[in-house]
Amino acid sequence: MVSVVMPAYNEEEIIENTVKEWYGEVVSRITGAELIVVNDCSKDMTGEVLARLAQEIPALRPLTPERNGGHGRALRYGFDHVTQDWVFQTDSDQQHIPSDFWRIWEQRETSDFVLGVRSTRADGPVRVLITTVMRMANFVVWGLWIRDANCPFKLMRRQAMEKVLVRIPRDSFIPMVILSILCRKMEYRVTEVVVQHLPRRGGEQSLGGLWKWLKVGSRCLRQLLALRVRLLWGRGNANPIGNRR
């Protein structure tokens, strides 16, 4: 009934606990559920840990793309392999609480997308600033006030998700931010649910200091602007907005 998808990169310290927590709290309690972990060509023992766990947990499906592509591409790779009617996106860094899933899950009957909103960001002022800037950029570029477009805690009806993703270039750096925008523009039923956010307990952060974050922010803004133009004119990989069927 649900495919839980999470990317992982150099998470050997915490990936076993992450998998066991999500399996015990969520996957084992839903008939037919699967846990897809995309090992984004980690340089540590993440892949080996996942391979061992897959022998113990049949619902675990570890996947490894041919090359490292970053968080966004790893998610798209995982989405390509889901088998269930609902898709849940989360991260493997243990900054979210698996039990919060049920608060999201209970909204599915009246929603196509249920999007988590972090109550507070627990990973430092730079990331809080980036979230604020992203919120303002979405308003300026798209005319939408989205509280937490990049929160990695989203439940999506698979059929609707696929119709949104086809409009997002596969090499997008921020596919889930754009998905948060397009599902509203395409007039799907969207619900927001406040969820907890914890400090990272281990593993490796994918992004570094302030200078790198500034470059990331600039790249995100360029992609938002470029996609806005592409969608407006119906060019490239993205179709014009307006018909979600």
Each model region followed by its residue ranges:
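A conserved acidic beta->alpha catalytic loop
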Residues: 39-48, 94
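Acceptor/aglycone-binding surface of glycosyltransferases and processive sugar-polymer synthases
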Residues: 65-81, 86-88, 95-173, 200-221, ...
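Short active-site alpha-helical segment characteristic of glycosyltransferases
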Residues: 96, 175-182
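Acidic helix N-cap motif at the loop->helix transition within catalytic regions
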Residues: 13-17, 44-53
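Short, well-formed alpha-helical segments that are part of the catalytic scaffolds
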Residues: 11-26
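Conserved donor nucleotide-binding strand/loop of the catalytic core
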Residues: 33-36, 47-81
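Catalytic donor-sugar/metal-binding loop of nucleotide-sugar-dependent glycosyltransferases
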Residues: 168-171, 180-198
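Cell-envelope/extracellular polymer assembly enzymes that use nucleotide-activated donors
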Residues: 1-3, 34, 178
